Amino acid sequence: MIDQFERLPGIGPRTAQRLALHLLRQPEDQIRAFAEALLAARSQVGQCQTCFHLSAEPLCDICRDGTRCDQLLCVVADSRDLLALERTREYKGRYHVLGGLISPMDGIGPDMLQIPSLIQRVDRDGISEVILALTPSVEGDTTSLYLARLLKPFTQVSRIAYGLPVGSELEYADEVTLTRALEGRRAMQ
C-alpha cells in the first residue's frame, strides 16, 4: 500500500507511510467507502465535451455557467492549472484544457493534445482573445509559441505575465524570473 501512495504526485515515502498506517487503523466500513469513492470517481469522471476539464457531466460547471464571458478563452495545460486560476476568482471567461504540453523529448507532439479542437473552437465561436496560461518552462514556451503562430490569424493572443512571487526576496530569484519580471513590468497606477 505504501508503494501505491508513493506513486501519487507530491507524496514521498514518509507521507505514504503515514497515509497507509492511518488507513490501517480505520474501521473496515470507512476503508471500503474510501475504496468505493475512488472507483466511482474513476468511472464517473470524464472530460467536458467543450473544454476538456474534468467533469461528471457532458459539460462542466464552467461551460454551463451562462454568466461567463464567451469571447475570452484561457488555454491551460491541465485541470490543475484551471483550478488554480479559478481560486483567484478574477477570471470570468471560458477555458480550454490541452491535456499537456508539447514535449518532443517525451514524445508528445501537437497532435497528441487538444490543439485541433482549440483551433476549431476559436474559429467557430468567434473568440476575441485567447490567453495562454502555460507554465514558464521549455515545454510551456514551445507550446505557447506554437499556439500563438496558429491562432494569430483568427484572434488576439496574449500570455499571462510571469514574475516574482509576493513576499519573495530579489536576491533569491533566478535570472529568468527576474528578466521576465522586468519585461512584464507595468506603470504604477
From Swiss-Prot:
Zinc finger residue ranges, C4-type: 48-63
Record-given protein name: Recombination protein RecR
Molecular-function annotations in GO: DNA binding; zinc ion binding
Protein task: May play a role in DNA repair. It seems to be involved in an RecBC-independent recombinational process of DNA repair. It may act with RecF and RecO.
Sorted UniProt keywords: DNA damage, DNA recombination, DNA repair, Metal-binding, Zinc, Zinc-finger
Domain Toprim: 71-165
Gene3D superfamilies: 3.40.1360.10, 6.10.250.240, RecR Domain 1 (1.10.8.420)
Organism (species): Prochlorococcus marinus (strain MIT 9303)
A GO biological process held by the record: DNA repair
NCBIfam families, per database record: recR
InterPro entries per the UniProt record, alphabetical: DNA_Rcmb_RecR (IPR000093), Rcmb_RecR (IPR023627), Rcmb_RecR_Znf (IPR015967), TOPRIM_dom (IPR006171), TOPRIM_RecR (IPR034137)
Top-rank taxon: Bacteria
Similarity section: Belongs to the RecR family.
